[in-house]
Every structure is written in structure tokens, then in C-alpha cells.
């Protein structure tokens, strides 16, 4: 099975069903005749930008829209505790276990001023393309990550 077909099926499942984890997603793919290894699914989810977000009823795997929607932005905002910076980088503190999802969301914003992110358990390090852009990146994050 080609990667494109697998990606399309993953998107279809995540847009039409509530899926709480990758194991559940593997089972749903198997029901559709797609056998996939955990490592392959993990790579697919990363490539598709799948986020694991907290909802009122627990966790859910979600695919962000090409233009990040307000629903995902709202979920990300609930996970952020603080955004701080120094002369060279920006640090985002999140709820425990939520840094990866926040980092993925930032990566999918595809801001040319952001070189990349590194996520731990509850901290995201945002590395700007240039240290001269720290202020504008902070402003951008306030606008795109928080609903103030």
C-alpha cells in the first residue's frame, strides 16, 4: 500500500471518528484492510501533523487544517502556561505531557521566522531564524497561540 493512500485513510479516519491513541488507529486501519506497523504509523502521524489534544472526554488524535483552525488554536491555548524569552530563544511552558503537541502546532504554522522547535515533556524551545526577530516572533506567538 502506498504512503499516499495510507495518509488519505488516516485523514479520513481522524476526521470522521474519535480516535484516542495510535493503537486504536491501527485497529481502525486494519478494519479497512490496511496493515501498518506501529513505527510506520508513528512516522505517518508525524508527517501528517497529527496532534494529541485533550477534550472534555479525554484525549483525541486530530489533524490540523492547512490553515490552523480556531478549535485547535483554542486547545493549544489551554495547554500553554507561559511564554518567555531571552536574547536568543523563546521558551514555552505547557501542561505536563503537552509540549509535543504545542511544538507540532508551531511547526505547522510554518513561520519563516522560526527555525524550529524542540519539545520535552512540558517545555518547548522555539529557535528563531535570527535573534534579531525575537520580539516579532513573541508577538506572532501571542497572536497565533493565545486568544488575547
UniProtKB/Swiss-Prot annotation:
It is found in: Cytoplasm. One of its GO terms (cellular component) is cytoplasm. Transmembrane segments: none annotated. Pathway: Amino-acid biosynthesis; L-arginine biosynthesis [regulation]. Its main location: cytoplasm. Pfam families: Arg_repressor, Arg_repressor_C. One of its GO terms (molecular function) is arginine binding. Keywords: Amino-acid biosynthesis, Arginine biosynthesis, Cytoplasm, DNA-binding, Repressor, Transcription, Transcription regulation. GO terms for biological process: L-arginine biosynthetic process; protein complex oligomerization; regulation of arginine biosynthetic process. SUPFAM superfamilies: C-terminal domain of arginine repressor, Winged helix' DNA-binding domain. HAMAP family: Arg_repressor (MF_00173). Regulates arginine biosynthesis genes. Belongs to the ArgR family. This is Arginine repressor. The lineage of its organism: Bacteria, Pseudomonadati, Chlorobiota, Chlorobiia, Chlorobiales. The gene is argR.
Amino acid at each position: 500500500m502506498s504512503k499516499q493512500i495510507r495518509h488519505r485513510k488516516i485523514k479520513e479516519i481522524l476526521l470522521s471518528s474519535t480516535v484516542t491513541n495510535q493503537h486504536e488507529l491501527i485497529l481502525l486501519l486494519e478494519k479497512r484492510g490496511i496493515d501498518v506497523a506501529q513505527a510506520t504509523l508513528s512516522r505517518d502521524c508525524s508527517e501528517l501533523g497529527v496532534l494529541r489534544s485533550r477534550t472534555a472526554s479525554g484525549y483525541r488524535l486530530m489533524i490540523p487544517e492547512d490553515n490552523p483552525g480556531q478549535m485547535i488554536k483554542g486547545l493549544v491555548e489551554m495547554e500553554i502556561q507561559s511564554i518567555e524569552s531571552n536574547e536568543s530563544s523563546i521558551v514555552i511552558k505547557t501542561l505536563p505531557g503537552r509540549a509535543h503537541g504545542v511544538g507540532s502546532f508551531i511547526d505547522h504554522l510554518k513561520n519563516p521566522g522560526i527555525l524550529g522547535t524542540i519539545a520535552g515533556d512540558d517545555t518547548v524551545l522555539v529557535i528563531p531564524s535570527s535573534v534579531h526577530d525575537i520580539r516579532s516572533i513573541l508577538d506572532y506567538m501571542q497572536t497565533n497561540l493565545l486568544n488575547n
